[in-house]
From Swiss-Prot:
Residues 246-250 are annotated as: ACP-binding. GO terms for cellular component: cytoplasm. Homodimer. It comes from Wolbachia pipientis wMel. This is Beta-ketoacyl-[acyl-carrier-protein] synthase III. Its EC number is 2.3.1.180. The gene is fabH. Its main location: cytoplasm. One of its GO terms (molecular function) is 3-oxoacyl-[acyl-carrier-protein] synthase activity. InterPro entries: ACP_syn_III_C, ACP_syn_III_N, FabH, Thiolase-like. Disulfide bonds: none annotated.
Amino acid sequence: MNKSFILSTGSYLPRKMLSNNEIASIVETSDEWIRQRTGIVQRHIADEGELTSDLAVNAAKSAIEKAKISVDEIDLIIVATTTPDKTFPSCATIVQSKLKCKNAFAFDVQAACSGFIYAVTVADSLIKSNNRIKYALVIGAEIMSRIVDWEDRSTCVLFGDGAGAVVMKSEMGRSGIISTNLYSDGNVDILCTNGGISSTGDSGKICMNGREVFKHAVDKLTASVEETLKCNNLKITDIDWLIPHQANIRIIEAVVKKLDFPIEKVINTVDKHANTSAASIPLALDYAIQESKIKSGNLVLLISIGAGLTWGSVLLHY
């Protein structure tokens, strides 16, 4: 059976940065308030003319260049996003067009902040079951600044824009992706938008019950790690690096405390990027590799939770 591994990573962050102090000039908040409750210091904001597909393409180009392959060799493109350019066609096919990946098939995955975990799982499954696929391009890309209510200080301080990408390769006998686990529970009301194409005719803005999200995030992310360890006969001490969804430093710290896992082995980019939804995990992964934190042979666990609720994990040897 063919197995998959992550061959390369790439990322893209818009040039414009928005500090906490700048947000404090828009809504009633402060740098201290945001830092203490979220760990966020700044976030990147897409330019007016930038589209989600543009962010995705830039991240993809970086990953493809590092993989040392041509766009013609890519067989599959999956884009995880909640902020596509259009209702249709998919963001993935727009990315395909912009990259000129003529030999790939492409589609989107929508699982909110868990989207990249879902997309990697789907790509891994397709690689294992389809001999046609040698190289898969998986991207998480979001422009969250377009769906936040900039008058709601409980949500507008949390989100940022960006994109991260990986090139996954199929190879007989080699396994980078060890296991994946996906979950959802239909608890849709605690984190959602207040609109949609079939209900209001527009995308709506983000609405969130922060306390409920925090409680569910800590419990479900912890359980996801424990289930992954159990399924693979591992102990928490076997994990070299944990990359959690970069939503809030308090959630990350609470999960790490429950797992009795050293914070020094947790990748944290929430201060730099804020919550970039489906882009969060690939951005953090690329950052950790570029900073020489994650090295070849390391056992890495990716975990995320998002609206739906959806959550899951990917365990991999890098």
